[in-house]
Design a protein with these regions (language model features):
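N-terminal secretory signal peptides
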Residues: 1-61
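N-terminal export signals
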Residues: 43-51, 55-58, 64-87
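C-terminal segment of N-terminal export signals and the immediately downstream linker at the start
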Residues: 58-59, 80-126
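Conserved, mostly hydrophobic/aromatic
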Residues: 130, 258, 338
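Active-site-adjacent beta->alpha loops and helix N-cap segments on the catalytic face
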Residues: 181-191, 209-210, 233-247, 324-325, ...
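Glycine/proline-rich, positively charged
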Residues: 203-279, 306-310, 319, 334
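Catalytic alpha/beta core domains of metabolic enzymes, predominantly
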Residues: 261-355
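C-terminal helical cap(s) of enzyme catalytic domains, especially alpha/beta-barrels
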Residues: 373-395
């Protein structure tokens, strides 16, 4: 009789508790979905973006939304009491053991000096330049398929602002950009935060339209023009160095420093034959002492721009300075600033080693794509590499 009375007493309450628990779950799911609009990258938002540092710190992550909903379980407490005995067979949540390790990101307090600067045109530029390919999702990851989407998901508007601000605080004052949206972002960032970050735009001329990309970039306020390495290689490979000459001359007439980017040293051989005078050089610069580097027997002039191949040996996005010895020899003869890029070989070489190789072998600046948690470590690596390269063969330019 007592058992029947207890069942009669708590049955309705258990039913109410079940309803409350279901409602809580639905509310959480709805608010999380609603909050997704705050996690979209800058170039996907329709509202006018706020590029201030305060806006970047606003709580907009899903975790923070759930923290704000901490009060909801209180209202489901009664229901949970009656469910706990029925769900006791579920596996408990096990804390992550310390043996899994934790990531220790370096802070600004751990900077080990100031990044030296040099001159490009009439601007003082940090010898470590922030590359933007990761911001766009350009990940040279061999045959891994997920890395590009991972970068695009990671670099939300807030994360971009945070990364740029951290780079500025670490002494990086110049960015190499690959989209006009990024230039808009820097313009707003400089305006709202009283900063003076310089920008170098990768432009993409075509045979049909040589100048529009250059003119648009200048109109948006860039400081330097860099003809993208893809176009530099292809124009030179196809015997159209004269078109590169036109792009360089068009930029110079407007008073802007200009470079032809190149993945292949043969691009600069073609530019020299055409008499092209750039203001600075922008060249891939890394060694080939990593396991995924293309075998020497398979390296061909302009191979970086050749068709991608599924076979093991032909080029397949695994090396960007196919002739490092010839590249270093060429750089030694130059009397203008050289910016080395792809120095990490798409993440295959550690920064300490990569930066030292680049500066020892003639680079005056290096352009490196990086995430926020890599900036302080890379700044320190650049500072020390420059210090150790003081006895290098080529004088410093810029």
């Amino acid at each position: 009789m007592k058992t029947h009375q207890n069942h009669h007493l708590f049955g309705p309450i258990e039913h109410v508790g079940r309803i409350i628990k279901s409602a809580i779950s639905k509310i959480r799911d709805f608010l999380i979905k609603l909050n997704h609009r705050f996690l979209l990258p800058f170039n996907r938002t329709k509202q006018k973006p706020d590029f201030s540092l305060a806006a970047a710190k606003e709580p907009k992550s899903r975790r923070e939304v759930l923290k704000k909903l901490a009060f909801l379980p209180f209202f489901g407490g009664i229901a949970w009491t009656f469910f706990s005995s029925k769900e006791s067979s579920a596996s408990p949540i096990v804390p992550v053991p310390d043996s899994c390790g934790t990531f220790q990101r370096r802070t600004l307090e751990e900077l080990e000096g100031n990044i030296p600067q040099g001159k490009l045109g009439n601007k003082s530029v940090s010898r470590l330049i922030l590359g933007s390919n990761p911001f766009c999702g350009y990940a040279h990851s061999r045959d891994l398929k997920y890395t590009s989407s991972l970068f695009r998901a990671y670099f939300t508007r807030e994360k971009l602002i945070e990364t740029i601000h951290l780079a500025e605080q670490a002494g990086i004052n110049t960015l190499n950009l690959c989209t006009w949206e990024q230039q808009h972002l820097i313009n707003q960032y400089n305006k709202q935060n009283g900063s003076n970050l310089h920008t170098m735009m990768q432009v993409r001329p075509t045979k049909e339209d040589l100048y529009s990309d250059i003119d648009r970039s200048i109109d948006l306020g860039v400081d330097f023009i860099q003809i993208r390495g893809v176009e530099g290689d292809i124009f030179a490979r196809d015997g159209n160095a004269d078109l590169l000459q036109k792009c360089v001359d068009h930029t110079k007439r407007q008073g802007y420093p200009v470079s032809v980017g190149a993945h292949d040293v043969h691009t600069f051989y073609a530019c020299d034959e055409a008499g092209i005078e750039v203001d600075f050089y922008f060249k891939t610069l890394h060694h080939d002492r990593y396991w995924s580097a293309l075998p020497k027997k398979d390296r061909l002039p302009f191979g970086v721009q050749g068709p991608k191949n599924t076979n093991r040996n032909p080029y397949h996005d695994n090396m960007w300075c196919l002739f490092p010895g010839d590249t270093v020899s060429y750089i030694q003869k130059l009397n203008k600033p050289v910016v080395g890029f792809k120095v990490l070989a798409g993440g295959a070489i550690y920064p300490d080693e990569a930066f030292q190789y680049a500066f020892d072998n003639g680079a005056d600046f290096i352009c490196v794509g990086m995430c926020d948690f890599q900036i302080v470590e890379n700044a320190n690596a650049a500072i020390h590499a420059i210090e150790k390269a003081n006895n290098r063969q080529r004088p410093w330019y810029g």
